[in-house]
């Protein structure tokens, strides 16, 4: 445990270092701490022994350590107030009507990246828990078909394909009815199981050439089992990272790996998660911060930013909290529209 004054000193060192990016000495703290310079130095020695601050080789001042940042985030930081300027920018970005879920997520990602200068990610509710609420097939011409899958979150997945030679339009109608009877209403995780157990047996009863029908099932629904990540500011990594840039950019461009990272640190009931110590050596000096947001009556999505360990945590977490609140508000409007017998407009 540290004393209240030591907590204030740590808070100031973290805040000042985030603004000035130079080591902080005891004289810099005198105006804000009601204690002598000697007392402040002694408290700084205690914080250093605890591993919360550390000395820079080129200066007598101190800078926060990874443990210090972690303590600050978990015990000191306050998120009660937003910057009025940040609030104005976020509200302006979300102004207007949204008719596609993807547009809301893109706006959130761009707002996060724009305000923090970091790489940002937006992730929908876990795919496995989403429900298939509707399925339609539309003949585009005598050979081409468009399948339209709608999930409970309002997300729409479309897939255009060539009708297999062995299938007629009547077969296609049977196929569509099978999907509606056996898959619509189920969660994605249950659909995955059904496609591998029940569907092959059912297909044998209705179709002469089963291989092409089973391939069609796989073609249409394979994309359903892949989560989509909305990203903004990938190139921002070059503004705050100096080592292993090629590996980092490769990671940030690999949605599947980033999905794994985000799901790994948010796999609990906490609304916010901060990961300082990463197993990957090229992520050693970076912090991953994730904030869940409410998707009304449908679960939780996730906002994530990745930046340097010495980032301004107070502002970054405040911006995350602000965007999460505004996004949830806009999602409420979106779902009221969607539930009112309207459909998401898909490209």
Swiss-Prot record:
SUPFAM superfamilies: GAF domain-like (SSF55781), Winged helix' DNA-binding domain (SSF46785). The lineage of its organism: Bacteria, Bacillati, Bacillota, Bacilli, Lactobacillales. InterPro entries: GAF-like_dom_sf, HrcA, HrcA_C, WH-like_DNA-bd_sf, WH_DNA-bd_sf, WHTH_HrcA_DNA-bd, WHTH_transcript_rep_HrcA_IDD. One of its GO terms (molecular function) is DNA binding. Keywords: Repressor, Stress response, Transcription, Transcription regulation. GO terms for biological process: negative regulation of DNA-templated transcription. It comes from Lactococcus lactis subsp. lactis (strain IL1403) (Streptococcus lactis). It holds the Pfam family HrcA. This is Heat-inducible transcription repressor HrcA. NCBIfam families: hrcA (TIGR00331). Belongs to the HrcA family. Negative regulator of class I heat shock genes (grpE-dnaK-dnaJ and groELS operons). Prevents heat-shock induction of these operons. It comes from the Bacteria.
